[in-house]
């Protein structure tokens, strides 16, 4: 077997999960690099976390990774350095690097333009329209439209769901009542939170959607791996049993039961291969009893948590 070293980007539960998988299968201790230490990996013996100042800045990230790769290759030229982004910020940074790091690392990434279109929720729904992928009815509003009160004119009734189109920018926004995503039962609730968000400095679009009825038992999560030739090699569907109840982690699952749906697999496989995807993809979806369809909420360009 080719000798390799996992290099993980981040310090969250995704990093711990990947490190645990590598340790259980190969007995390896992973090396992780992040701009902030999170609790899941803080005291772990199966992953060494290195904190790098300003590591979420592209120039800092690229320069550091080039130096790291050069040093590690010099130490052991025959060892493969397997680079895996485990968070949205790092997946975005790696896509911006393109092929710049391939002299030292082996990794999958997307063309930066495709990466941005998929990661940004409003453009992801446009892509869903092109590929006839079911998704909730959606109204996207800009900062200027929020000032003009456009969020009051929705093409669907309450309750509604709301989430930021730019999840990376949202990480740096703080205000009373901040959550990863919202469900509003009346217009007053929506107006209060959307105004607070933009007053706190959020600048990107906000996505407001028709709420799909039913509790979390209707949710499904799909993970797929697509190789460098844009062929789907693995797909796994899960039925979430327990969701993280904390406001900033809504949508993160603590327990998932394996599931199977051939129709969902066929549709997602055709989509990923047609857009020439590469790497790991994670989809959140919910079953809509009104039309019998699984509606896509988003794609994450990384493993699911």
Predicted regions and their residues:
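Glycine-rich phosphate/pyrophosphate-binding beta-alpha loops
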Residues: 241-253, 300-305
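Phosphate-binding site of ATP-dependent enzymes
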Residues: 184-244, 259-266, 287-295
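Active-site nucleotide/adenylate-binding loops and adjacent lid/helix of ATP-dependent enzymes
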Residues: 117-206, 228
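Oxyanion-binding "anion nests"
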Residues: 247-250, 257-283
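Conserved metal-phosphate-binding beta-hairpin within the catalytic cores
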Residues: 269-305
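Short acidic/His/Gly/Ser-rich catalytic and metal-binding motifs that mark active-site loops
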Residues: 40-43, 169-173, 243-248
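ATP-binding N-terminal substructure of ATP-dependent carboxylate-amine bond-forming enzymes
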Residues: 1-110, 147-148
């Amino acid at each position: 077997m080719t000798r390799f070293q996992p290099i993980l980007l981040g310090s969250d539960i995704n990093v711990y999960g990947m490190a645990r998988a590598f340790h259980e299968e190969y007995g390896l201790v992973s090396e992780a690099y992040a701009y902030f230490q999170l609790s899941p990996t803080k005291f772990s013996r199966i992953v060494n976390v290195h904190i790098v100042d300003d590591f979420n800045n592209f120039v800092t990230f690229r320069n550091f990774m080039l130096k790291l790769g050069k040093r590690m290759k010099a130490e052991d030229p025959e060892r493969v350095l397997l680079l895996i982004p485990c968070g949205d910020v790092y997946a975005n940074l790696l896509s911006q690097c393109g092929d710049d790091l391939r002299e030292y690392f082996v990794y999958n990434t997307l063309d930066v333009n495709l990466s941005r279109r998929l990661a940004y929720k409003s453009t992801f729904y446009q892509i869903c329209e092109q590929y006839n992928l079911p998704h909730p009815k959606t109204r996207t509003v800009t900062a200027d439209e929020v000032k003009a009160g456009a969020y009051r004119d929705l093409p669907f009734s309450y309750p509604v769901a709301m989430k930021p189109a730019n999840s990376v920018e949202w990480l740096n926004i703080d205000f009373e009542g901040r959550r990863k995503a919202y469900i509003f039962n009346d217009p007053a609730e929506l107006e209060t939170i959307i105004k607070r968000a933009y007053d706190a400095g959020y600048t990107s679009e906000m996505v407001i959607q028709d709420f799909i009825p039913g509790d979390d038992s209707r949710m499904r999560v799909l993970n797929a791996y697509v190789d460098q030739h844009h062929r789907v090699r693995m797909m796994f569907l899960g039925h979430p049993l327990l969701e993280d109840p904390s406001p900033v982690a809504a949508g993160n699952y603590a327990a998932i039961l394996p599931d199977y749906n051939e129709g969902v697999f066929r549709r997602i496989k055709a989509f990923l291969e047609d857009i020439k995807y590469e790497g790991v993809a994670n989809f959140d979806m919910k079953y809509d009893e009104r039309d019998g369809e699984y509606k896509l909420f988003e794609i994450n360009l990384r493993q699911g948590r």
